[in-house]
Amino acid sequence: MSVILRNDYGAIAVNKGVIERMIIDDLLDIGDEIILCTKKGKPIKDKPARFYDPSRFTDPDYFDAVEVYEKKQQVRVKVFIITAFGSSISELTDEIFRRIENDFAILKLNNPGIITVNIKGVMSEDQIVRRNIEVIRKNV
């Protein structure tokens, strides 16, 4: 499935898997502050494999952490994460928003209409405490 992005020059179709892969790669670069998770808050991996590492394959479970879809002629992005205890939610979400918008700029696309970061839990030393915090950025 592809996402169709429209601008003054016409329409561009980009495979949503390409955008999701770029976003996941950026999320993995953030480091120990986040763990990618599913919609229900289940952690995907403790030490995920990198996409650009030729010795490893892409695990399809990673794609459960990111949703890219089109609604009302806007691209929308949802990200599902678990944060580390003590990390600043505002700083962390701002960094995620900036990286996602940068990915769209690399592809010469308009910023997504809505970016949503769903924080499904907070990880302490030995357990994950469930949370359901949603931080939204609207680009109009």
Give the ranges of each region predicted by the language model.
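Contiguous, often N-terminal, cationic amphipathic patches that form binding interfaces
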Residues: 1-95, 106, 110, 116, ...
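Short acidic (Asp/Glu) patches
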Residues: 98
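Acidic-enriched and Gly/Ser
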Residues: 101-103
